[in-house]
Structures are given as structure tokens and as C-alpha cells.
Amino acid sequence: MARIAGVNIPNHQHAEIALTAIFGIGRTRAQKICDAAGVGRNVKMKDLSDSDMDRLRDEVGKFTVEGDLRREVTMNIKRLMDLGCYRGLRHRKGLPCRGQRTRTNARTRKGPRKAIAGKK
């Protein structure tokens, strides 16, 4: 298995798909990285030469990925919570912050239902 940006990349997948194993790289960015590095999108990772891998590493290194990106996202959410703005309050309460309804649904953010004694 090859390592790029501290992540083990699966050998049996095509380069375009395998790069999406890195946090912060989706299909579109993976396509652009492959094109910029001059690596075919449909070439399996195990078939790439060392020079191809080095070019991929260089291209991935130009983006904020993995730990740095996770840290940045966490800091952005923490900043919102410290400001006390509406989005920060919603994050603090564990509720959706993009305007979705919460009377019904929103179970993913709110967690499992809490039983209320005396109901029924």
C-alpha cells in the first residue's frame, strides 16, 4: 500500500478513486490532481511507478488535507461558538444550523429519542 499525506492508499483501486481515501479530496479534486500529475485516472495504484507516486504526493501536498483540514474545520466551529452567533449556538446545542426543521426529523443531530415519563 502506498502512503500519501499520511494515509494508506488502497492498491487495488484506480488512482482517481483511491485518492478519495484522503480526507479533503473528493472525486473532482482527485481528477484534477491526476491530470496535473500526468497520471491516468484509470490506472490502478499498484501499477504506478515511484516517479508517478512522487508527482501525486507533490500535487496532494499543494492542498490542505487530513489533520490540517480537520483542525481548521474544528477551529472554525469553535470560533462560531465563542462568538455566540446563531450558528455557534446551534452547534453548542447540537441542533441543525442551516435552517432545517426540528419539530420532526433532525434525529441525526439530536441523537436518539429521549423517553418522557407520564406521556400517553
Curated annotation (Swiss-Prot):
Q: Which InterPro entries match?
A: Rbsml_uS13_C (IPR027437), Ribosomal_uS13 (IPR001892), Ribosomal_uS13-like_H2TH (IPR010979), Ribosomal_uS13_bac-type (IPR019980), Ribosomal_uS13_CS (IPR018269)
- Coiled coil stretches, renumbered: none
* Gene Ontology CC: one annotated term: small ribosomal subunit
Q: Name one GO biological process term.
A: translation
Q: Does the keyword Cell cycle apply?
A: no
In Pfam terms, one family for this protein is Ribosomal_S13
Tell me the segments the record calls region Disordered.
96-120
- What molecular functions are annotated in GO for this chain? rRNA binding; structural constituent of ribosome; tRNA binding
The entry's keywords: Ribonucleoprotein, Ribosomal protein, RNA-binding, rRNA-binding, tRNA-binding
As for what it does, the entry says: Located at the top of the head of the 30S subunit, it contacts several helices of the 16S rRNA. In the 70S ribosome it contacts the 23S rRNA (bridge B1a) and protein L5 of the 50S subunit (bridge B1b), connecting the 2 subunits; these bridges are implicated in subunit movement. Contacts the tRNAs in the A and P-sites.
| Sequence similarity | Belongs to the universal ribosomal protein uS13 family.
Stored PANTHER family: 30S RIBOSOMAL PROTEIN S13/40S RIBOSOMAL PROTEIN S18, SMALL RIBOSOMAL SUBUNIT PROTEIN US13M
The record describes its quaternary structure and partners as: Part of the 30S ribosomal subunit. Forms a loose heterodimer with protein S19. Forms two bridges to the 50S subunit in the 70S ribosome.
Q: What is this protein called?
A: Small ribosomal subunit protein uS13
